[in-house]
Curated annotation (Swiss-Prot):
Domain KH-like: residue ranges: 353-437
Organism of this sequence: Xanthomonas oryzae pv. oryzae (strain MAFF 311018)
Family: Belongs to the TRAFAC class TrmE-Era-EngA-EngB-Septin-like GTPase superfamily. EngA (Der) GTPase family.
Assembly and interaction partners: Associates with the 50S ribosomal subunit.
Record protein name field: GTPase Der
Pfam family of the protein (one): KH_dom-like
């Protein structure tokens, strides 16, 4: 296990900027606005290959124990409590504050090894800034400007000198057998509540306030002997309602999470049905070609009549993805969790199945003989052979002639035939049609000597007339 370093401080002192500098990533959202970070975000610092360590970015502690601010503070305290070293970050431009004093008092009670990090010293007198924070009594102080990457090397030296060889941090592995699941949907449909329920702890901040989750946070889970990576994402609103830059960044991170996952769980609110924005998010999942499971949350609070209405709306608005399984759950009370994971397993197995060329050609032959392509303006498409073209989604490349006139209805027939034959559920299926090149196209047959002589006689005869 690697040593764990926690970044702690009040809002907007630059913790996320330091996190990005140490991890050489842009994983943490950064904006000149307090309260951007809320959930714990873990990364690995490998700037010194001899001594890598885990860094955890935390939300700013604002001194309020209620609502989102209180939940954010609890997340920060949890991170500091499990850390081997705490980096207490303060703002060198604004100077010390009463909130810094409160955080320092709490850190002293925690009794974890702590380094004072004075950020944003660019444009200031460093000695003056250091003297202002001297009353905190730290022997280990690092002054830096994370935005300009000044002082990061000094910070690494200080951290390296204080870290144990073994620590309490667990590294997110790159095990290809680990199923990557992204929970996506509109704001306030219960994504964070569901992830917390699966983890058995308040790992994500869950609130009735829409837009609570700002970043895409990945955590590992072992359940029934299988390994998963759960990705909690920010809710996606309609583009016309997205005004703040932070929300635009959050939306980008959510779309990025969809691209990187293997199974996307689209969460719907049973009390609101299927909205146009739900369909837009579904479109993003289909564009990425990801396996899909639809989770209808808050199902337990609905009457029989409301459930019947929701089922009817679901079949009408999501009929075009009838291949995706829909699971009724309650993230708050934990009902439907087993059914949800069973659907995820089936979708993942279908999306990542490796097909042999012989079995897909046999399927194409049966489909072709059972229902040949129709004649279009006297032209009939011929399907010669097919081979696998990849997974997630399953892709089949069909070769033949006159495929440009192959009607869409026949392409849907092939998709449905392959789904039924190979029992593919919960995943899109992609067909690519390629026509074989005509080797004689653009070429003329060479004439024999006899044909040349005949052509000359014919031309003399025509001219003679």
């Amino acid at each position: 296990m690697l040593p764990l370093v926690a970044l702690v401080g009040r809002p907007n002192v630059g913790k996320s900027t330091i996190f990005n500098a140490l991890t050489r990533t842009r994983d943490a959202l950064v904006h000149d606005q307090p309260g951007v970070t809320r959930d714990r975000n873990y990364g690995v610092c490998r700037l010194d290959e001899q001594q890598p360590f885990i860094v955890v970015d935390t939300g700013g502690i604002a001194g309020d124990e209620d609502g989102l601010a209180g939940a954010t503070a609890r997340q920060a305290r949890a991170a500091a409590g499990e850390a081997d070293l705490v980096l207490f970050v303060v703002d060198g431009r604004e100077g010390e504050s009463s909130l810094d004093d409160e955080i320092l008092a709490w850190l002293r009670k925690l009794a974890r090894p702590t380094v004072l990090v004075i950020n944003k010293i660019d444009g200031t007198d460093e000695e003056t800034v250091r003297s202002e924070f001297a009353r905190y009594g730290f022997s280990d102080v690092v002054a830096l400007s994370a935005a300009h990457r000044q002082g990061i090397d000094e910070l690494l030296e200080e951290v390296g000198a204080r870290l144990p060889e073994e620590g309490s941090g667990e590294l997110l592995d790159n095990d290809p057998a680990r199923v990557r699941i992204a929970f996506v949907g509109r704001p306030n449909v219960g994504k964070s509540t569901l992830v917390n329920r699966l983890l058995g702890e308040e790992r994500m901040i869950a609130s009735e306030v829409p837009g609570t989750t700002r970043d895409s946070i990945a955590v590992d889970l072992e359940r029934d002997g299988r390994q998963y990576r759960l990705i909690d994402t920010a809710g996606l609103r309609r583009r016309g309602k997205v005004e703040e830059a932070v929300e635009k960044f959050s939306a980008f991170k959510t779309l990025q999470a969809i691209e990187r996952c293997q199974v996307a769980v689209l969460m719907l609110d049973a009390t609101e049905g299927v909205t146009d924005q739900d369909a837009t998010i579904l479109g993003a999942i289909l564009d990425a070609g990801r396996a899909l499971v639809v989770a209808i949350n808050k199902w337990d609070g609905q009457s029989d009549y409301q459930r019947a209405q929701a089922e009817d709306l679901l079949s009408r608005k999501l009929g075009f993805v009838s291949w995706a399984e829909a699971v009724r759950i309650s993230a708050l009370h934990g009902s439907g969790m087993r059914e949800l994971f069973q659907a995820i397993h089936r979708a993942h197995a279908s999306a990542t199945h490796e097909f042999s060329t012989s079995e897909v050609n046999q399927a194409l032959e049966i489909a072709y003989e059972t229902n040949p392509p129709p004649s279009i303006r006297g032209h009939v498409s011929k399907l010669r052979y097919v081979h696998p073209g990849g997974a997630n989604p399953p892709t089949f490349i069909v070769h033949g002639t006159r495929l440009k006139v192959l009607p869409e209805s026949y392409k849907r027939y092939l998709e449905n035939f392959f789904r039924k034959r190979f029992k593919l559920v919960g995943t899109p299926v992609c067909f690519i049609f390629r026509e074989g090149a005509n080797p004689y196209e653009g070429k003329k047959n060479p004439l024999s000597d006899r044909q040349v002589a005949r052509k000359r006689r014919l031309m003399r005869h025509v001219k003679g007339k």
